[in-house]
Amino acid sequence: MNLEVEIAGVKLKNPVIAASGTFGFGREYSKLIDISEFGAICTKGITLKKRNGNPQPRLCEVYGGIINSVGLENPGVEAFVNEELPFLKGFNTKIIANINGFTKEEFVELTKVLSSLVDMIEVNLSCPNVKEGGMVFGKDPEKVYEITKSVKDVASCPIIVKLTPNVTDIAQLAIAAEKAGADAISLINTVSAMAIDIETRKPLIKMVTGGLSGPAIKPIAVRMVYECFKKVRIPIVGMGGIMNYKDAIEFFIAGATAIQIGTVNFINPKAVCEIKEGIEAYLERKGFNSIKELVGNINI
């Protein structure tokens, strides 16, 4: 069965990608599974300088998922290039660098450093814009356009723009990214959420709110992938609560070219193998010759 997909000329041997933030830089998981099983690995979020992240507690379990407010803890781009990237290049899989900036200039600088070293870059626009009162870049179509264009102007590899679901109309963000030259979009990022300890009356997350991931957000993610698929022609990487192959199939039918799996990696490190096998069995059972035939193939 042909599971190969292509995003802006980059061929992935299968459409299952390790999502940013749940896989670190692959070192821990490499002791449990062959991480070459993934079609690609999307790195933990990378910033220009080292970040220690937010204060603890910054992770809590809730019905149907996890709320996190890790705060982009990472060693910084220089340490990533010198220490983590050589390790990742030892595996037979594509590497996607997830970049995070707090100004347009930081996104541009990160792209200049990384675009010749990795297969693709995923631009996380859920960072606060420190020059404009902390508003999240990705909520404003004009900012999405501006940053995407600035990054594309200096990039030597394909650019994936990661979209936030915490907006009224995500398709408008997708359109802005496409107009600015994005090679693909990925969605959805986490959904803004909160949980409270009723005994202490304190939020379970030190920063009060965080991002919800896991199966609770899957129906939202599927809807948003479908809405974007109807509006743009560039490939969509779908994510949000994928726990098994059936969840993955929904995303392909809704219009995703590839998928990312995140929260499930915490629960089942072997999920990538099980999801791949399930997709293959489904395609054979339904008479498809390749995964590409399923993308956007919805009966309405």
From Swiss-Prot:
Enzyme class: oxidoreductase
Binding site for substrate: K44, N68, S69, V70, G71, L72, N124, N189, T190
Any one annotated GO CC term: cytoplasm
Keyword Oxidoreductase: yes
InterPro entries assigned: Aldolase_TIM, DHO_dehydrogenase, DHOD_1B, Dihydroorotate_DH_1, Dihydroorotate_DH_1_2, Dihydroorotate_DH_cat, Dihydroorotate_DH_CS, Dihydroorotate_DH_I
Gene3D superfamilies noted in UniProt: Aldolase class I
CDD domains (alphabetical): DHOD_1B_like
Annotated GO MF terms: dihydroorotate dehydrogenase (NAD+) activity
Catalyzed reactions: (S)-dihydroorotate + NAD(+) = orotate + NADH + H(+)
Residues given in the record as FMN binding sites: S20, K44, G45, N98, N124, K162, I188, G214, G240, G241, G262, T263
Active site residues per record: C127 (nucleophile)
Pathway where it operates: Pyrimidine metabolism; UMP biosynthesis via de novo pathway; orotate from (S)-dihydroorotate (NAD(+) route): step 1/1
Highest taxon in the source lineage: Bacteria
Any Gene Ontology biological process: 'de novo' UMP biosynthetic process
PANTHER family: DIHYDROOROTATE DEHYDROGENASE (FUMARATE), DIHYDROOROTATE DEHYDROGENASE (QUINONE), MITOCHONDRIAL-RELATED
Family: Belongs to the dihydroorotate dehydrogenase family. Type 1 subfamily.
Assembly and binders: Heterotetramer of 2 PyrK and 2 PyrD type B subunits.
Protein name: Dihydroorotate dehydrogenase B (NAD(+)), catalytic subunit
Naturally occurring in which organism (per UniProt): Caldicellulosiruptor saccharolyticus (strain ATCC 43494 / DSM 8903 / Tp8T 6331)
Gene (UniProt): pyrD
